Amino acid sequence: VTSNKNKTYVAEIIGSDPSTDLAVLKIKSDELLPFIPFGDSKVARIGEWVLAVGNPFNLNSTVTAGIISAKSRDLNDRDSKNQSFIQTDAAVNVGNSGGALVNTDGELIGINTAISSFTGGFVGYSFAVPSNIVRKIFEDLIEYGNVQKGLLGVSGSALNAELAEKFEVNETQGFLIGEVIEGMGAAEAGLKNGDIIKKVDDVKINTFSDLTGYLSTKRPGEKVMVSYSRDNTREKITVTLKKTNTTQFLGMYLTNINAEQKEYFDLDHGVIIKELGNQRLYRYGIDEGFILLEINNKKIKDVADVDAVDFESLSSIVFLKPNGERERIIFE
């Protein structure tokens, strides 16, 4: 790591989160280093002035100014699991990714991560991961080594006039639940298909990115108050967020192994392939029912460990076959 004073430090990677393209580094230094305080991205307002700091085109410590153009922006055409960005018109180009988005009080309210462009250069819009999400990821990586994701357990669509007419409801704002996932917090609390989520705690919910953005700041086991509408009647209910037990990696749909599988194979770690959509792995003899034990020589305890893997550094995977044999796949 090189500072503005051109001093170089050795850093240790504490952890990373590929879904937001963030990592935590521990810098080895005998001196106190300057730092920026976290701001509250939740209270940042549209129209508020912000500064974007980065190194575009290797132009070190470049600062550009703009305003917040939108919040909870959903970039569903991009390969990103995070779908709740701050949109600004501050000039951001190649090399700005990972730079700070700062408010006029000198507080961090986001980490610059993407631009909207057909040319690869800045054309008016840039996007940042909100600081409240960044802070939670930072704390999770230090404490747990991976990101703890608290899930409500619903899917659906943002309500609009067309859906309101179709489902015969007297409102056009909110998140319309299309599916309640069995075994998750929403189902256990009593939420149903057709319910319209209006708020989670004190946060208004109009889009899926509103919902995922707020829940990205929560951990499994935490409780949230869900305000919803059912049959045109407003209700409130407390939901306990659950830990995800499924993920997708290299075309494999993976889930945590259960107690019975752990006992049968004498394992204390691993995730099992429920579906396989990767023909290359299939040609290597990998199939549904195989248990993924290690990635890059590191034990995989659960799907959260899989989500923390940096795809670009992938070197090897160890599988356990249903017959008890182990197989290692090497990636070059």
State what each model feature region is.
Residues 280-283, 324-329:
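Short, surface-exposed beta-strand/loop "edge" segments at domain boundaries and coil↔beta transitions
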Residues 186-207, 273, 280-304:
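Conserved PDZ fold ligand-binding element
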Residues 1-189, 199-223, 229-248, 255-260, ...:
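Serine-dependent protease modules
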Residues 7, 298-301, 321-323:
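Intrinsically disordered, low-complexity Ser/Thr/Pro-rich linkers and terminal regions
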Residues 236, 241, 245-276, 281-282, ...:
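C-terminal structural cap/anchor segments
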